[in-house]
């Protein structure tokens, strides 16, 4: 677990899983809002990726690449899990820092001879949408197959404020995908 990124390397796979809460505001200028996002390699080929950091393209691309929809994670109502500072004076001194936060918790691993399962939760949507996001990723060690589930857990069963959601898996450029009936 390096800098709150869980890393697991198997015979034919490599997994990076973001299980860290956001940094303090003072040191958050490079934070990308992708709680429970992950990157996955199989047979040394990167398959699933985040969008990267667009700082070599433009300031706008850099900002957009930090939002939740640019990460391989669940996104509710096309919103980002954190709000970013909009004050130009603060941004010119400290970079674009975050002004809201959340916690990642209940990180678990279960590994045996045939599979690896990792899971965690975050409460970034608790105040806005009354729910906690739980992600579980399971890797079959024999063939490298990756399976996962995302759950939204209501904090208060009386209200649930979600209009739409998306779960994005950004494929590495050059990777082709085919939809199956499974």
Predicted feature descriptions by range:
Residues 178-182:
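Short, intrinsically disordered, charge-balanced linker/junction segments flanking boundaries
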């Amino acid at each position: 677990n390096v800098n709150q990124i869980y890393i697991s390397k198997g015979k034919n796979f490599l997994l990076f899983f973001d299980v860290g809460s956001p940094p303090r505001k003072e040191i958050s200028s490079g934070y990308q809002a992708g709680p429970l996002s992950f990157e996955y390699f199989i047979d040394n080929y990167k398959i699933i990726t985040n969008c990267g950091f667009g700082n070599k393209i433009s300031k706008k691309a850099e900002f957009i690449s930090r939002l939740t929809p640019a990460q391989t994670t669940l996104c509710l109502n096309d919103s980002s899990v954190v709000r970013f500072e909009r004050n130009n004076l603060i941004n010119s001194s400290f970079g674009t820092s975050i002004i809201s936060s959340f916690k990642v918790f209940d990180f678990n691993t279960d590994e045996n001879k045939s599979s690896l399962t990792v899971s965690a939760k975050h409460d970034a949507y608790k105040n806005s949408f009354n729910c906690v996001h739980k992600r579980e990723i399971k890797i079959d060690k024999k063939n490298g197959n990756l399976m996962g589930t995302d759950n939204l857990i209501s904090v208060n069963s009386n209200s649930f404020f979600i209009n739409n959601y998306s779960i994005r898996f950004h494929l590495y450029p050059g990777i082709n995908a085919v939809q199956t009936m499974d």
